[in-house]
C-alpha cells in the first residue's frame, strides 16, 4: 500500500504521494492536500469518509425522501457492520450513519457506534427527532449530529437540537433540503434560528440541494437567485452556513465577492475520497447514484476478506474508476466538479 498512517488519541495523519490529511478526532477538523500543500488531493488511495446505511426502515414519512423509505424495510446486522469495518482501509476517519427519523429502527445502532469508536473511527449521524435517552447516547458516541428540519416535525427538531447542546455537544447542525418548493420555508427557518432560544447554540445551518430521486421526483431544483437570497439572509442574521458538496457550484456563485471562498468549498468527492455502502453491504460511489445507470447493482463489500481486497475489488474496480473519471470531466470555470447524474 502506498500510504502510511500515524495516529494518537487526538490526531490521525495519512501521507501518500498524491493525497494527504490530518484529522482531529476530537473536533472533526480535517486538512487535506495533494503533492504539496498548495494543491488539491487528486484521489485518495482509499476512502477517508464512509456513508453507511444501517436501516431502510423509517416511519418519518418525509415527502421528498430520496430513499422512499417506509415502516417496512430491513436492518444491517451487527455482524456485517463489524466485517465491513474490519476489512476497511485504515484511511477511514469517520462514518456518517444512514438511519431513520428517530433512530429506533436498528437495535444494534449503539453497538455499531461503540465498535466504530473502538477502531478510532468517529461516528456521525442525522436524525429528525429523538427522546432524552437517545440524546444521551448520541452525546456519548457521536462527533457530530445533524437534525433534519421538516415542516411536519419542526418543534421536535428544535427540541432535539436543544437536548444535544444542553449536553455540551458543539457540533450540532440543522439540515435543510432545498428546492423551489421549500425555499420559503428555508427563509422562515433562518428567521427562527435567529430568535428561537432552543437554537441559540446551533453550530450551523446546512443546505442540502435537491437530487430528484425517490419521493423527491416532482420537486424542482432551487434557482441561483433564490439560493443567493438564502445566503444573503443568513449573513445578515450572522448565522453560520454549511452546504453539502452537491451545492458547491451554487455556493461558489453566491459567494462570488469573496476571493478566498474557493479555499473553503469542496466539490463532489465521490469515488475520490468518500464512499457509500448500503444496508446489503454493497458499495456505490454515493448514496444518490444507487440504482442509476451503470450502478443498478453495487459492488459486494462483504465478499472482501481484508484491506487489500477492498482496495482492489471496490476502490480500484473499473466501475469506480469510470465514475471518478466522469466526475472529473464535469469541472467548471471555478474548478468545481458537478454531479454527473443529477441537475443540481
Residue ranges and their predicted role:
Residues 1-10, 14-20, 26-29, 282-283, ...:
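Flexible mid-to-C-terminal extensions adjoining Fe-S/redox cofactors in radical SAM and related proteins
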Residues 22-23, 276:
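Hydrophobic beta-strand positions
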Amino acid at each position: 500500500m502506498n500510504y502510511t498512517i500515524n495516529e494518537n488519541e487526538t490526531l490521525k495523519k495519512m501521507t501518500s504521494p498524491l493525497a494527504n490529511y490530518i484529522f482531529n478526532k476530537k473536533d472533526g477538523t480535517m486538512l487535506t492536500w495533494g503533492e504539496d500543500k498548495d494543491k488539491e488531493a487528486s484521489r485518495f488511495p482509499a476512502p477517508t469518509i464512509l456513508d453507511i446505511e444501517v436501516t431502510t426502515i423509517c416511519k418519518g414519512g418525509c415527502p421528498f425522501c430520496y430513499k422512499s423509505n417506509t415502516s417496512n424495510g430491513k436492518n444491517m446486522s451487527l455482524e456485517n457492520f463489524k466485517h465491513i469495518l474490519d476489512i476497511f482501509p485504515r484511511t477511514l476517519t469517520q462514518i456518517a450513519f444512514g438511519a431513520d427519523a428517530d433512530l429506533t429502527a436498528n437495535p444494534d445502532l449503539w453497538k455499531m457506534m461503540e465498535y466504530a469508536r473502538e477502531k478510532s473511527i468517529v461516528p456521525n449521524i442525522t436524525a429528525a427527532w429523538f427522546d432524552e435517552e437517545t440524546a444521551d447516547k448520541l452525546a456519548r458516541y457521536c462527533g457530530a449530529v445533524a437534525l433534519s428540519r421538516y415542516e411536519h416535525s419542526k418543534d421536535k427538531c428544535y427540541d432535539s437540537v436543544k437536548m444535544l447542546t444542553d449536553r455540551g455537544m458543539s457540533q450540532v447542525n440543522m439540515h435543510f433540503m432545498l428546492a423551489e418548493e421549500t425555499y420559503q420555508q428555508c427563509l422562515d427557518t433562518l428567521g427562527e434560528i435567529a430568535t428561537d432560544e432552543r437554537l441559540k447554540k446551533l453550530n450551523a445551518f446546512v443546505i442540502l440541494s435537491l437530487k430528484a430521486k425517490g419521493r423527491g421526483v416532482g420537486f424542482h431544483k432551487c434557482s441561483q437567485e433564490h439560493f443567493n437570497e438564502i445566503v444573503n439572509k443568513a449573513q445578515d442574521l450572522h448565522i453560520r452556513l454549511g452546504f453539502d458538496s452537491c451545492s458547491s457550484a451554487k455556493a461558489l456563485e453566491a459567494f462570488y465577492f469573496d476571493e478566498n471562498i474557493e479555499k473553503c468549498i469542496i466539490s463532489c468527492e465521490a469515488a475520490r475520497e468518500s464512499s457509500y455502502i448500503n444496508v446489503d453491504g454493497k458499495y456505490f460511489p454515493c448514496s444518490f447514484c444507487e440504482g442509476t445507470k451503470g450502478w443498478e447493482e453495487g459492488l459486494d463489500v462483504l465478499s472482501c476478506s481484508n484491506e487489500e481486497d477492498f482496495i482492489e475489488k471496490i476502490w480500484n474496480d473499473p466501475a469506480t474508476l469510470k465514475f471518478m473519471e466522469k466526475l472529473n470531466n464535469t469541472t467548471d470555470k471555478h474548478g468545481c466538479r458537478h454531479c454527473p447524474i443529477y441537475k443540481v
